[in-house]
């Protein structure tokens, strides 16, 4: 457990934290995702919408992936830990990370989503 906590603290210590400001994201803060395939589309829509309206904070793929990781729990969080430990290139590739999540959690979709 200590290792997981340290990993998450290291992720959160980065530039993801926005400077204090008055503007507030109008999109509700995304719920967590635990690996339930049926909830994956909803999770992706929630997180994508939240990041879309705040492009200043989520200005690159690494920040977007880091935000997704902060919303993972249970089996989904366990799944991502090896990627963090190995410093996988997927951590800097938002589309690639989403594609891997979809593959791992069994979500089949149309190419356009």
Curated annotation (Swiss-Prot):
Q: Which organism is it from?
A: Homo sapiens (Human)
Q: What else is known?
A: RTL8A is one of at least 11 genes called Mar or Mart related to long terminal repeat retrotransposons. They do not correspond to functional retrotransposons, but rather to neofunctionalized retrotransposons genes.
The family annotation for this protein states: Belongs to the FAM127 family.
Provide the disulphide bond pattern.
none
Q: What's the name of the protein? A: Retrotransposon Gag-like protein 8A
């Amino acid at each position: 457990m200590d290792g997981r906590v340290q990993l998450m603290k290291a992720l959160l210590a980065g530039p993801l934290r926005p400077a204090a400001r008055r503007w507030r994201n109008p999109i509700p803060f995304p719920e967590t995702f635990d690996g339930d395939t049926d909830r994956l589309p909803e999770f992706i829509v929630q997180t994508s919408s939240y990041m879309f309206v705040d492009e200043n904070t989520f200005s690159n793929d690494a920040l977007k992936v880091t935000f997704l990781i902060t919303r993972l729990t249970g089996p989904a969080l366990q799944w991502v830990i090896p990627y963090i430990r190995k410093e996988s290139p997927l951590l800097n590739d938002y589309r690639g990370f989403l594609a891997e999540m979809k593959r791992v959690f069994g979500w089949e979709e149309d190419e356009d989503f």
